[in-house]
Amino acid sequence: MKKNERIRKNIEFRRVYRRGKSYSNSLLVLYVFKNNNNVDTSRVGISVSKKVGNSVVRSRVKRLISESYRLNCSNIKEKYDLVFVARNKSKDKTYKEIEGSVTNLLKRAGLYN
């Protein structure tokens, strides 16, 4: 993902958490906020708590989520801020299960074309 497609600052994460709508399943929680700024692309942030595991496990989960988003981002509506929060169950899952969870949440949010 390019730098302008990522949510990096704490204030941006908090805005999505407070004002956005949430969708969840057993592996992930998705927060969606309609971004009315002059940004033409959707931005994404990924959050994995220390409850999920050590740094190796957390990084693996982040990589799986970001890769599944990257491969499906061409099918996603633009001008949204998205934050994926990994749940504890996601640490043992395969790429296919994480990808299915990501696409399921995007479809439920109405962002998947």
From Swiss-Prot:
EC number: 3.1.26.5
GO BP term, pick one: tRNA 5'-leader removal
A Pfam family reported for this protein in Swiss-Prot or TrEMBL: Ribonuclease_P
Reaction it catalyzes: Endonucleolytic cleavage of RNA, removing 5'-extranucleotides from tRNA precursor
Coiled-coil segments: none
NCBIfam families linked to this entry: rnpA
Purpose of the protein: RNaseP catalyzes the removal of the 5'-leader sequence from pre-tRNA to produce the mature 5'-terminus. It can also cleave other RNA substrates such as 4.5S RNA. The protein component plays an auxiliary but essential role in vivo by binding to the 5'-leader sequence and broadening the substrate specificity of the ribozyme.
PANTHER family associated with the record: RIBONUCLEASE P PROTEIN COMPONENT (PTHR33992:SF1)
The protein, known as: Ribonuclease P protein component
Organism this protein belongs to: Clostridium novyi (strain NT)
Gene: rnpA
